[in-house]
């Protein structure tokens, strides 16, 4: 097997650049560059020298002998000055060693998986942790790397294997009455409890999609109610055209924000009204589709001239908010639970706090343990289908019951990587950056 290397510390130039090395030739390479092998897991400062005797850099080196390393192989890290020239010269020197090459994306983590240092859930969560942009995404990733999900799924899988073993025992000893009683008393009760637990877990996973994929918030309302001004105020910059002429927004405009620690996709839509303009009609149809798909619809009214609009059927929460608070005298305006001026910012802080509270409320509806990725969720759904098939058709031959439970246990094993998932590995580890 080759020894691999990569810059694992990010873009250059930087204060420090960390070069990671893993594989069977690490010890010889470190000795050649440092002049000796540093003590394991202790940072060593000294000069690094090329094999032709030329000076490379003054650096910190740390050696991690197998199996006590990230990959489970011999590993080393070199902490160099973060100059492009220094790093490129050092990488060139590493490439001169036989069997030593630049790592592919995610190759260090893939080796850690192959050596049993990570399971598949932990590997996916590690990639998510590196990509996390919000606090909710960070917590989601940490949950996966902790191993708690793996423990849960392996426990469920072991319960299915045990149930299947009891069923096969009845097949082998069908003339033994005590064995038959054991099946009816133990197996189905436990399988039904397991089925309920997995169903609840799947429901949690459906709700938890917002942590990874974000909430969809749509700004809707009649033309010229100030929707684009709200968009610009929330974005903190001008992203939507604001004009006195009604109907200037013809398409949906989407931006990404972070509210209450959640990623939020905020969409400004065309004003809803009857029109003969074909282009505007198309924009209104697009707006209606966004409303259908939304988690929250902010229905905006001009407080001095509120116009009702027809919304499509949607499961989203709908807020009726009044805009242009600065333009109208108290006696000439309708009162709204949420009212502000997007143009001047009057009372807009309250609106933002309400949005953050909405996001936090959605997070609070999610439990502490749930599938972190759609791949995991899909395999759980496949497993539950097999379990339900076994439970709902008690008249099935016992061998078919056993087969349904076997298939369910295979799906659970694929989540953690305990069952062969070779076809998935290239996809999963390609998501990693070089050097991880």
UniProtKB/Swiss-Prot annotation:
In terms of superkingdom, the source organism counts as Bacteria
Would the keyword Cytoplasm be found if you checked this record's keyword annotation? yes
User: Binding positions for GTP?
Assistant: 224-229, 243-249, 268-271
Q: List keywords of the entry alphabetically.
A: Cytoplasm, GTP-binding, Hydrolase, Magnesium, Metal-binding, Nucleotide-binding, Potassium, tRNA processing
Instruction: Name any cofactors this protein relies on.
Output: K(+)
Q: Where does Mg(2+) bind?
A: 228, 249
Transmembrane segments in this chain: where?
none
Q: How is the cofactor bound?
A: Binds 1 potassium ion per subunit.
The main location is cytoplasm
As recorded in UniProt, its EC number(s) are 3.6.-.-
Signal peptide span = none
Question: Matching SUPFAM superfamilies, A to Z?
Answer: P-loop containing nucleoside triphosphate hydrolases (SSF52540), TrmE connector domain (SSF116878)
Which GO biological process categories is it annotated with? tRNA methylation; tRNA wobble uridine modification
Molecular function (GO) terms listed?
GTP binding; GTPase activity; metal ion binding
* Residues annotated as binding (6S)-5-formyl-5,6,7,8-tetrahydrofolate: 20, 77, 117, 436
GO cellular component, alphabetical, reads: cytoplasm
Location(s) in or outside the cell: Cytoplasm
Assembly and oligomerization: Homodimer. Heterotetramer of two MnmE and two MnmG subunits.
> What is its biological role?
Exhibits a very high intrinsic GTPase hydrolysis rate. Involved in the addition of a carboxymethylaminomethyl (cmnm) group at the wobble position (U34) of certain tRNAs, forming tRNA-cmnm(5)s(2)U34.
Q: Name the family.
A: Belongs to the TRAFAC class TrmE-Era-EngA-EngB-Septin-like GTPase superfamily. TrmE GTPase family.
Q: What is this protein called?
A: tRNA modification GTPase MnmE
Gene from which the chain derives: mnmE
């Amino acid at each position: 097997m080759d020894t691999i290397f990569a810059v694992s510390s990010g873009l250059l130039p930087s204060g420090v650049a960390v070069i990671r090395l893993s594989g069977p030739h690490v010890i010889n390479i470190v000795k050649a560059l440092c002049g000796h092998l540093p003590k394991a897991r202790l940072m060593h400062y000294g000069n690094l020298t090329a094999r032709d005797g030329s000076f490379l850099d003054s650096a910190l080196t740390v050696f991690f002998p197998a199996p006590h390393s990230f990959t489970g192989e011999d590993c080393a890290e070199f902490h160099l000055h973060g100059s492009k020239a220094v790093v490129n010269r050092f990488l060139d020197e590493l490439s001169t060693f036989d069997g030593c090459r630049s790592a592919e994306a995610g190759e260090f983590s893939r080796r850690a998986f192959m050596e049993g240092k990570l399971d598949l859930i932990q590997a996916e969560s590690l990639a998510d942790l590196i990509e996390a942009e919000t606090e909710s995404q960070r917590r989601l990733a940490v949950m996966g790397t902790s191993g708690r999900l793996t423990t849960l799924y392996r426990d469920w899988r072991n319960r299915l294997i045990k149930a299947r073993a009891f069923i096969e025992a009845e097949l082998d000893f069908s003339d033994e009455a005590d064995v038959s009683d054991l099946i009816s008393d133990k197996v189905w009760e436990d399988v039904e409890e397991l089925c309920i637990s997995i169903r609840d877990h799947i429901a949690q996973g459906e709700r938890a999609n917002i942590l990874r994929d974000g909430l969809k918030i749509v700004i809707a309302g009649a033309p010229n109610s100030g929707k684009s001004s709200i968009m610009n105020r929330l974005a903190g910059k001008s992203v939507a055209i604001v004009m006195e002429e009604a109907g200037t927004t013809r398409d949906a405009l989407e931006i990404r924000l972070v509210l209450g620690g959640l990623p939020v996709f905020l969409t400004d839509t065309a004003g809803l009204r009857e029109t003969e303009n074909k282009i505007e009609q198309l924009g209104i149809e697009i707006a209606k589709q966004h409303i259908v798909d939304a988690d929250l619809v902010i229905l905006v009214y001009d407080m001095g001239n509120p116009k009702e609009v027809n919304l499509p059927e949607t499961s989203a929460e709908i807020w009726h908010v009044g805009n242009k608070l600065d333009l109208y005298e108290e006696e000439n305006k309708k009162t709204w639970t949420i009212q502000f001026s997007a143009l001047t910012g009057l009372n807009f802080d309250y609106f933002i706090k309400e949005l953050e509270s909405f996001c936090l409320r959605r997070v609070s509806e999610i439990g502490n343990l749930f599938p972190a990725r759609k791949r995991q969720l899909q395999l759980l759904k496949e497993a539950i289908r097999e379990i339900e098939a076994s439970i709902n058709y008690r008249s099935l031959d016992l061998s078919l019951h056993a087969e349904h439970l076997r298939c369910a246990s295979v799906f659970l094993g694929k989540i953690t990587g305990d069952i062969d998932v070779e076809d998935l590995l290239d996809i999963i580890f390609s998501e990693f950056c070089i050097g991880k």
